Curated annotation (Swiss-Prot):
The lineage of its organism: Bacteria, Pseudomonadati, Pseudomonadota, Alphaproteobacteria, Hyphomicrobiales. ATP binds at residues 221-223, 484, 536-539. Aspartyl-tRNA synthetase with relaxed tRNA specificity since it is able to aspartylate not only its cognate tRNA(Asp) but also tRNA(Asn). Reaction proceeds in two steps: L-aspartate is first activated by ATP to form Asp-AMP and then transferred to the acceptor end of tRNA(Asp/Asn). GO terms for biological process: aspartyl-tRNA aminoacylation. The record marks 33, 83 as: Important for tRNA non-discrimination. It is an enzyme of class 6 (ligase). It holds the Pfam family tRNA_anti-codon. Residues 199-202 are annotated as: Aspartate. This is Aspartate--tRNA(Asp/Asn) ligase. Belongs to the class-II aminoacyl-tRNA synthetase family. Type 1 subfamily. It comes from Rhodopseudomonas palustris (strain TIE-1). InterPro entries: Aa-tRNA-synt_II, aa-tRNA-synth_II, aa-tRNA-synth_II/BPL/LPL, Asp-tRNA-ligase_1, Asp-tRNA-ligase_1_N, Asp/Asn-tRNA-synth_IIb, AspRS_core, GAD-like_sf. L-aspartate binds at residues 175, 221, 450, 491.
Length: 591
């Protein structure tokens, strides 16, 4: 017999009855029913009920056991008594009558229980992550994550992609966020950077004559805490292809992502034949570049119905050409209570309020806006929005560039409050035609909107003749249920176009050479047209596991202060280590 087990805790069935077995695992739960001890023994594979009564030679040892002790149990498999089967367990028809117990690892008093799924403070869960990971839901999420990554790999290889590994120590580059820097001992005063993404390396692979690259790549960004991103590191399905158009990339990747979602959707519908939505249309209809298409609400520009109207607040705004009035339809929301609730919500979001019109059963409009603009305009708005009696519409006005984010939040809020969002669906879409540049209000200059290596639509001619803020890029995102889950683009593979693109964003040619020297040199020796994308592994897993917290699908995450409470990172290092790296600390004054 094996030293520790003949079977796992998830293996025993009716066919094993009367067999002598050996199991090892953790004491998940111990119950005393009238002097009979029931030990639920758990391992990675499942749970088995073990029974010790006073006649068992191991009863005295069983009485000493406590939760989460690691034990070896020998015993005989028997049928559970009639009426005590547990249909929720694969092993629920049998139990093990205990004949011998060996304690392999006793456990101290638990700072959080493993049995049950009680909510515990995050700092406790992260400090004792090894206990937290024993809990069923989190443990299963981590296993699902591994299966999803396996599925991604398999599907990428079926599409003809080959997996590569790119360096972790690289050069610092301006890709949007701060780099994590690693000091060089051999080169005093110089630093490596952990890659924010394998962007340059994967493009260099295309210039090296390879094709169809992919990698499950760790990425590192020293960013301030955000609700939708873990501090420190994240993983992406990184992809690059040579001699391709945007449509070629869509054709290769849409089946991969669709297939992964279908495999793990647990019965939810998955979009087939993804819609392609232009960035400008997405912002106008949904108020965001990552629309949740489960929500059927589409916003409309209804400025013409308020221009010159009796509602002077909007009418005066519309005298300025840049201002508009957008409507957010609210099907079924035509009650004063709901409209007042939305108005209060808007005020809580820092807005002066949220104008509304509701249509009563007779079809007439009601509310302050309807009273001011009159029945003819009110009816025209209802017709334009396709609304009926019992519906409502909410309105935002001003400069769209300033109110669009709030309008998107309002659309989501209306959809949630009116139960319009289809929770049994993964709604996937491409968002295309992103602007190449945007105006940076902080630095008062034109800057890259997204990836600086993207090809501008119109190429060199667009860079030299168009207003930069009107140039679109061959750049695209994949969105799902309100999350951006992938981003990519066709690359700017001509060196003169690359230099010009960076020049518009305020980078001189020498700075481009200094920062991207390897790739810039490679461009001089025959660079193929190429493009790719990167899909966020963490966000995809989060969606498929049905959680909204990335920590629920990550093994050892940091907290929102970028601290690893289990390992004690970041930590101080010894003076000797600092001297070897030629580093002298200049700490901020904490007084």
């Amino acid at each position: 017999m094996h030293r520790y087990r003949t079977h796992t805790c998830g293996a025993l069935r009716d066919s094993h009855i009367d067999q002598t077995v050996r199991l090892s695992g953790w004491c998940h739960r111990i119950r005393d029913h009238g002097g009979v001890l029931f030990i639920d023994l758990r391992d990675h594979y499942g749970l088995t009920q073990c029974v010790a009564d006073p006649d068992s030679p191991a009863f005295k040892d069983a009485e000493k056991l406590r939760a989460e002790w690691v034990v070896r149990i020998d015993g005989k498999v028997r049928r559970r008594p009639e009426g005590t089967d547990n249909p929720d367990l694969p092993t629920g028809a049998v139990e093990v009558f205990v004949t011998e117990i060996e304690v392999l690892g006793p456990a101290g008093e638990l700072p959080l229980p493993v049995f049950g799924e009680q909510e515990y403070p995050e700092d406790v869960r992260l400090r004792y992550r090894f206990l937290d990971l024993r809990r069923e839901k989190l443990h299963q999420n981590i296993m699902t994550r591994g299966a999803i990554v396996d599925s991604m790999r398999r599907r990428m290889k079926e599409q003809g992609f080959f997996e590569f590994q790119t360096p972790i120590l690289t050069a610092s580059s301006p890709e949007g966020a701060r780099d994590f820097l690693v000091p060089s001992r051999i080169h005093p005063g110089k630093f490596y950077a952990l890659p924010q993404a394998p962007q340059q390396y994967k493009q260099l692979l295309m210039m090296s004559g390879f094709d169809r690259y992919f990698q499950i790549a760790p990425c590192f960004r020293d960013e301030d805490p955000r609700a939708d991103r873990l501090p420190g590191e994240f993983y992406q399905l990184d992809v690059e292809m040579s001699f391709v158009t945007q449509d070629d990339i869509f054709a290769a990747m849409e089946p991969v992502i669709t297939g992964v979602f279908e495999e793990f959707a647990k019965g939810k519908r998955v979009t087939k034949g993804w819609p392609r939505i232009a960035f400008a249309d997405s912002m106008r209809k949904y108020g965001t570049d990552k629309p949740d298409l489960r929500n059927p609400i589409e916003m409309q520009d209804v400025s013409e119905h308020f221009r010159g109207s009796g509602f002077k607040v909007f009418a005066r705004m519309l005298e300025e050409q840049r201002n508009q009035v957008w409507a957010i339809p609210g099907p079924g929301g035509g009650s004063r209570a709901f409209c007042d609730r939305m108005n209060s919500w808007a005020q809580g979001e820092g807005q002066p309020g949220l104008g509304y019109i509701m249509w009563r059963e007779g079809g007439e409009g009601a509310g302050p806006l309807a009273n001011n603009i009159g029945p003819e305009r009110t009816e025209a708005i209802r017709t334009a929005l396709g609304l009926k009696a019992g519906d409502a519409a909410f309105f935002v006005a001003g400069d769209p560039s300033k109110f669009v984010k709030f309008a998107g939040l309002a659309r989501t809020k209306v959809g949630e409050e009116l139960n319009l969002i289809d929770k049994d669906q993964f709604a996937l879409a491409w968002v295309v035609d992103f602007p190449m540049y945007e105006y940076n209000e902080d630095d008062k200059k034109v800057d890259f909107s997204h990836n600086p290596f993207s090809m501008p639509q119109g190429g060199m001619e667009a860079l030299t003749s168009q207003d930069p803020l009107t140039i679109k890029a061959f750049q695209y995102d994949i969105t799902c249920n309100g999350y951006e889950i992938a981003s990519g683009g066709i690359r700017n593979h001509r060196p003169e176009a690359m230099v010009k693109a960076f020049e518009i964003a305020g980078y001189g040619e020498q700075e481009v050479v200094d920062r991207f020297g390897g790739m810039y040199r490679a461009f001089q020796y025959g660079a193929p047209p190429h493009g790719g994308m990167a899909a966020g592994v963490d966000r995809i897993v989060m969606l498929l596991c049905g959680t909204t917290n990335l920590r629920e699908i990550s093994l050892f995450p940091m907290n929102q202060r970028a601290e690893d409470l289990l390992m004690g990172a970041p930590s101080e290092v010894s003076p000797k280590q600092l001297r070897e790296l030629h580093i002298r600390l200049n700490l901020p004054d904490t007084k």
